[in-house]
Regions:
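Hydrophobic membrane-insertion alpha-helices, especially the h-region
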Residues: 9-25
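Cleft-lining beta-strand/loop regions that shape enzyme active-site pockets
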Residues: 28-40, 44, 48, 52, ...
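N-terminal, post-signal-peptide region of Sec/Tat-exported proteins
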Residues: 59-88
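PDZ/PDZ-like peptide-tail recognition elements
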Residues: 78-114
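Structural motif
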Residues: 132-134
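Residue-level recognition of conserved beta-strand edge/terminus positions
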Residues: 138-139, 170, 341, 356, ...
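Polar, glycine-rich mid-to-C-terminal structural blocks
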Residues: 299, 311, 318, 322-389
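Conserved functional hotspot residues or short segments at active or partner-binding sites
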Residues: 352-353, 357-525
Length: 525
């Protein structure tokens, strides 16, 4: 298939990645002459030189420049951002879809690096490391007894492909320290978490972000499901803050017919660039459902909007974030970068889904809180839409612009999470910590159990629910969970499944009673 080469990766992250939303990137270098017209830069340069040469105390002019750049960009829009060198490397790595490391999922548990699960067939698994092992030393570097931030830990464990590192670990089951030599290798950072069957002839694919490898991962998952005879597909974009625009476009192309419009952009000078679908999509006729929520942004909204506006997909969930700006990146010699908004993107019917930002960045991000206060997350009729931003699809369906994708089928937040207490538990990650500690205390209780046997074991007793209630009390949380016992039990079981069997099994458990998935399946009856 051919993708419009004018669209480069959107590296977004709607408040999920770096505490800011990084927007759609277009592939066009910013030439020095484009900046020549900005005569004010002379004033800035003179000021920096004056401070550097004459200020009474020693001062780091680099930090002043960074603050200046930050301040300038913050006055433009919420998505024009400065990215310092350390964060730029992290973003690039995440969106690349892989890195070189030892292949473990871990927690900083109390004062040590605790392995949740080695990556299957990864370097650590091959070397013999196991779930529950504590990494004490990486070479001669001590990794326990202090709180190292995750990025510092990663830097100790990463390296050149093929390089070897000796790890000293404490294995609780044997009550002794062990040494392992681990050869670093390329570790995939999956953007497609799961592809599985969720009903008769219905497949499900979860995309957590749009990275360089997303389209390839998606095609692999879709092909696997098609071999199982799917007639309908659910694409889960909940909490997907975006990613590479061209990857979202490529996914959309699999569902649309030749020459159907996917997305278009408009720049300051009025230039319009359109991207159309090509013939030969692998799922042009089956039913498609897209799950979204208030954290689905940018590239996710491009995909959802393309399918909704072409009457090709049914959107299920809650109004999406509302991120419709396109950025161009300018790199600096120190490894930092600026992403500047240079265009807006529009869905096929011509709507911009960018929410207003004229009142400043603080009000812009506060809008998410306003949705809770207005009741929008609980009732469809609380969604504010303007008649002036009303559009029609080819089949006459009314869709709205001005702030996110409005779903065709609304699913309130309490249908998913029961109440605010449960939603809070999921945000804190406390369920994962509880499960890790339970397994750490008695991993043998699950030893040798096949997955179906595990499910029977978890359903036969409410032991872990009661233990969890005590656990959260000990952490200082006084949350009433009795009314949502079944829901909390499902999350506990799903987390046990993840840590014991892997990510796919988490979804196998959690999707069985998922409110949005159930809404889709009820439509098909």
């Amino acid at each position: 298939m051919k993708i419009n080469s004018k669209y480069l990766p959107i590296v977004i992250g709607a408040v999920f990645a770096l505490g800011t939303v990084l927007g759609s990137l277009m592939n066009a270098p910013v030439e020095d002459q484009l900046l020549a017209k900005n005569y004010s830069k002379t004033k800035l340069n003179k000021l920096i030189d004056f401070i550097n040469n004459e200020y009474v105390d020693s001062v780091n002019t680099d930090s002043i420049v960074n603050l200046t750049v930050d301040n300038i960009l913050s006055k433009l829009d919420p998505h024009s951002v400065y990215i310092p060198p350390s964060e730029q490397a992290e973003v690039a790595e995440s969106m690349k879809g892989d890195f070189v490391g030892i292949g473990i999922n871990f927690y900083m548990y109390k004062d040590s690096v605790a392995i949740i699960k080695p990556v299957e067939n990864g370097p650590s698994a091959k070397a013999g490391l196991k779930s529950g092992d504590r990494i004490l030393f990486a070479g001669k570097t001590k990794l326990f007894g202090r709180r190292l931030p995750s990025d510092s830990l990663f830097s100790k464990l990463k390296g050149i492909k093929g390089s070897e590192i000796e790890l000293t670990v404490f294995r609780k089951s044997e009550q002794k320290n062990l040494k392992f030599k681990v050869k670093r290798d390329v570790i995939p950072i999956k953007s497609v978490d799961a592809s599985l069957m969720v009903g008769n002839k219905t497949g499900y694919i979860k995309i957590n972000r749009f990275a360089e490898t997303t389209y390839r991962e998606f095609k692999t998952g879709l092909s696997r499901l098609q071999k199982q005879g799917i007639q309908s597909l659910i694409i889960d974009l909940r909490d997907n803050g975006g990613g590479y625009m061209e990857e979202a476009v490529a996914v959309a192309d699999e569902f649309l017919k030749d020459r159907q419009l996917i997305v278009f952009t408009k720049s300051k000078n009025g230039t319009t660039d359109k991207t159309f679908a090509n013939a030969g999509g692998s799922f042009e006729s089956g039913k498609v459902y897209v799950l979204i929520n208030e954290n689905s942004a940018s590239a996710s909204e491009i995909l959802a909007g393309a399918l909704q506006d072409n009457d090709r997909g049914t959107i299920v969930g809650r109004r999406s974030f509302g991120k419709g700006l396109v950025q161009r990146e300018m790199d600096f010699n120190d490894g930092s970068a600026v992403r500047l908004t240079v265009a807006r993107y529009y869905t096929p019917t011509g709507r911009s889904i960018q929410k207003p930002y004229k009142k400043g960045n603080e009000e812009y991000y506060k809008e998410s809180e306003d949705r809770i206060k207005s009741g929008e997350l609980y009732a469809r009729d609380s969604i504010k839409v303007a008649d002036s931003l009303k559009f029609k699809t080819p089949k006459g369906k009314i869709v709205y612009g001005g702030g996110g994708i409005v779903p065709d089928i609304f699913v309130p937040i309490e249908a998913e999470h029961g109440n605010e207490n449960v939603a809070y538990l999921l945000q804190t990650g406390i369920v994962g910590h509880f499960v890790f500690e339970e397994l750490d205390r008695n991993r043998d209780a699950f030893k040798g159990l096949h997955f179906n046997e595990f499910l029977v074991k978890m359903k036969s007793s409410d032991t872990y629910f009661r233990k969890f209630q005590n656990y959260i009390l000990m952490t200082g949380l006084d949350l009433k969970l009795d009314k949502t016992k079944a829901l909390v039990n499902r999350y506990i079981t799903a987390e046990f499944a993840r840590q014991l069997y892997g990510e796919l099994y988490y979804y196998d458990v959690s999707l069985k009673e998922d409110a949005m998935v159930k809404a889709v399946l009820s439509q098909k009856k």
